[in-house]
């Protein structure tokens, strides 16, 4: 009986320690560089299906996350999202209006945004949903782009510098 009690006590102690670790939210802070070899093929080249930044600078606190995405020959795109899901304005190139919100969902970060701009064909509205997940020094972002009812999803993998 004593062995049984000790075994159960040890199992419970180990299990109790694992639960908070498994539920802990991911930390996304750092500098991340796109790894083209691990990413979807359709995100690079002159006409990518969905654009991803070549490099991300991320600063995360308990209340918010600040992201600056840079690419060659492109203006940086930056935003600071409140992690409670509040809507914020995203700093985008001139002529583009973008709003977004972010929320931690377990170990993932989910960012939704809406981009609008005028074109010769009329006003364009594009919705995005990004799901971020981290495994060690690798950040994976799965982004879905929806415009006029048509959706496309691509994946980008970033390495931490």
At which residue positions do the language-model features occur?
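A periodicity- and composition-biased signal for non-globular, repetitive helical segments
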Residues: 8-9, 149
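Bacterial N-terminal signal peptides that target proteins for export
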Residues: 1-8
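Hydrophobic small-molecule pocket/channel-lining residues, especially in calycin-type beta-barrels
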Residues: 20-161
């Amino acid at each position: 009986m004593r062995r049984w009690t000790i075994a159960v006590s040890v199992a419970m102690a180990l299990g109790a320690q694992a639960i908070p670790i498994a539920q802990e939210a991911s930390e996304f802070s750092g500098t991340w560089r796109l790894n083209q070899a691990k990413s979807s093929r359709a995100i690079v080249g002159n006409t990518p299906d969905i654009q991803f930044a070549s490099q991300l600078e991320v600063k995360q606190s308990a209340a918010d996350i600040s992201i600056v995405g840079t690419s060659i020959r492109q203006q940086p795109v930056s935003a600071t999202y409140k992690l409670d899901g509040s809507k914020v304005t995203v700093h985008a190139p001139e002529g583009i209006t973008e709003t977004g919100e972010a929320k931690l969902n377990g170990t993932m970060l989910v960012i939704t945004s809406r981009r609008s701009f005028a074109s010769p064909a009329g006003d364009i509205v594009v919705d995005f949903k990004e799901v971020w997940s981290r495994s060690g020094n690798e950040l994976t972002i799965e982004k879905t782009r929806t415009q006029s009812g048509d959706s496309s999803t691509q994946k980008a993998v970033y390495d931490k510098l």
